[in-house]
Amino acid sequence: MSVQEITETRQYLTFKLGNEIFATDVAKVREVLDLTTITAIPRTPDFMAGVINLRGSVVPVVDLRLCFEMSKTESTRNTCIVVVEVLLDNESTVIGALADSVEEVIDLEPEQIQPAPRIGTHIRTDFIKGMGKRDTQFIMILDIDRVFSAEELAAVRGQETGKPLEAAA
């Protein structure tokens, strides 16, 4: 979904990675968890923090900071896991994303969202749905379905099903 496709007010969950504020559509967010024990999985990509047990389900957890070529997420009292539902080949997949902190849920009007800059950002522009502007602050609105490439998501889904991670080896 591009900026042009946003035609109505939407709600976004805002969260911090480092000093930058990001947002994702609340419709994609299942829940926000306090940081819990994450079990590391050998031979997975660096961005794959591990898995958690969420009410009997194995949920892969990804370090978004590493996905965006930032330093690894440090554990603080504000660190949390944002559990999101993304589409891979028209199939719903639940993934946890580490965030330094969750800020708030905000409403953004279509006119408050501008296209992402094509240069000057360390995040791939196809990951960014747009730049939200609230007061004097810019918020990077993520297209959470595109944050992970098909290959990376396939590796994460392999963890859920116990299939080998040939692409990640």
Across the structure, where does each feature detected by a protein language model lie?
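An acidic, low-aromatic, low-complexity terminal/linker signal
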Residues: 1-169
